[in-house]
């Protein structure tokens, strides 16, 4: 039996112990949550040839140029992924992309762990900024 990329990704996620809170097989995406690890509505989307991993972090306040500079410095320390802005520049997201073709469980787990580590390390700073 040949598994689709979507089925493979779902298997990896379930194998890691995550609960899938939402699934859209047509769009080939799942949403996972793990409050203890700071994972909330984490979207994992198969967009061949890549897998997109994305989570909303905070809304961006109006004057955020200093914070954007700080985010670029933080990005330099991240093992995987990066803090990015949405197209409108109004929302801060964590985002990572992986190649689907030879994706393995360790690689996917590493990207998810990177989000948890980034939030553990920088959550206070992000919250302080979000409050203005």
Model region roles, listed by residue range:
Residues 1-39, 77, 84-86:
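Charge-rich, low-complexity N-terminal segments
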Residues 80, 84-113, 117-132:
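Well-ordered alpha/beta subsegment
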Residues 9, 67-71, 126:
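Generic structural signal of hydrophobic/aromatic residues within well-ordered alpha-helices
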Residues 36-38, 59-61, 100-101:
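Short, surface-exposed beta-strand-loop junctions and turns on beta-sheet-rich folds
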Residues 52-91, 97:
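Short, internal acidic amphipathic alpha-helical interface segments
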Residues 27-30, 49-51, 90-92:
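Hydrophobic residues embedded in beta-strands of well-ordered beta-sheets
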Residues 4-8, 63-67, 107, 111-114, ...:
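Short amphipathic alpha-helical segments
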Residues 40-58:
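A short acidic-to-branched-hydrophobic micro-motif
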């Amino acid at each position: 039996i040949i598994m689709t990329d979507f089925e493979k990704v779902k298997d990896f996620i379930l194998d890691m112990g995550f609960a899938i809170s939402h699934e859209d097989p047509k769009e080939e995406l799942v949403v996972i949550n793990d409050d203890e690890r700071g994972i909330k509505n984490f979207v994992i989307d198969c967009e061949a040839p890549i897998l997109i991993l994305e989570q909303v972090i905070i809304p961006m306040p109006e004057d955020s140029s200093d914070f954007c500079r700080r985010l670029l410095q933080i990005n330099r320390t991240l093992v995987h992924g990066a803090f990015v802005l949405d197209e409108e520049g109004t929302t801060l997201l964590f985002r990572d992309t992986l190649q689907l073709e030879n994706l393995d469980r360790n690689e996917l787990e590493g990207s998810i762990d990177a989000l948890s580590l980034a939030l553990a390390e920088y959550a206070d700073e992000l919250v302080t900024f979000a409050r203005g």
